[in-house]
């Protein structure tokens, strides 16, 4: 029984993920000192942060051997041109091929997108060669 518990605990620890903001990431000298290699690290999209700081955080994480997965909040994306720009920046500057799609914290959309499904239906992530998309659902709203 103890062996099964230890195996379960080990698998649980090996498969967890964590979320950072560019600001919090700036306080960490090396992620290798605080996280196991290959950990998936979600990068929160903070509307008052510029997209370049989020892309730089993703690049740093990927360069250090982690799986950067930035947030794409639908309601904060003005239009397809902005979505294309963000996808291109993450893909070409940071080597990102995974993303977390969510509606976002705004109650009303800033532009053309209201939900994560609309981001998927745009086809932009497929066109860019993204390999994995996660979707966040908040039944109570987000």
Q: For the regions a protein language model found, what residue spans apply to each?
A:
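Active-site beta->alpha loop and helix N-cap motifs at the rims of alpha/beta catalytic domains
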Residues: 2-142
